[in-house]
C-alpha cells in the first residue's frame, strides 16, 4: 500500500490522533468518508453536454 509498512501507518495514525484527539476522530473519519463518497459519485456521473444549437426567436438579423 503505497510503499508504507505497518510501522509507518501506525505512526501516521498516532500523529492524527494527537492532532485531532480521540473524541474528534469519528467526526473527522465520517467527514472524510462523505468527501470520498461525493468525489466518487461526481467522477462516475456521465457528463452529457447539449450541443444542439438553440433557436433564438428574438434574434435581430
From Swiss-Prot:
Keywords: Cell inner membrane, Cell membrane, Membrane, Protein transport, Translocation, Transmembrane, Transmembrane helix, Transport
Example GO molecular function: protein transmembrane transporter activity
Keyword Glycoprotein: no
Classification via Pfam families: TatA_B_E
Entry keyword Transmembrane: yes
Membrane topology annotation: Single-pass membrane protein
GO CC annotations on file: TAT protein transport complex
GO biological process, one term: protein transport by the Tat complex
Subcellular location: Cell inner membrane
Subunit structure: The Tat system comprises two distinct complexes: a TatABC complex, containing multiple copies of TatA, TatB and TatC subunits, and a separate TatA complex, containing only TatA subunits. Substrates initially bind to the TatABC complex, which probably triggers association of the separate TatA complex to form the active translocon.
HAMAP family documented for this protein: TatA_E
Family: Belongs to the TatA/E family.
NCBIfam families: tatAE
Protein name per the record: Sec-independent protein translocase protein TatA
Name of encoding gene: tatA
Amino acid at each position: 500500500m503505497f510503499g508504507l509498512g505497518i510501522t509507518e501507518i501506525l505512526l501516521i495514525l498516532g500523529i492524527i490522533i494527537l492532532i485531532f484527539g480521540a473524541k474528534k476522530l469519528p467526526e473527522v473519519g465520517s467527514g472524510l468518508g462523505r468527501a470520498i463518497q461525493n468525489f466518487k459519485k461526481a467522477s462516475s456521473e456521465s457528463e452529457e453536454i447539449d450541443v444542439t444549437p438553440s433557436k433564438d426567436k428574438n434574434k435581430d438579423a
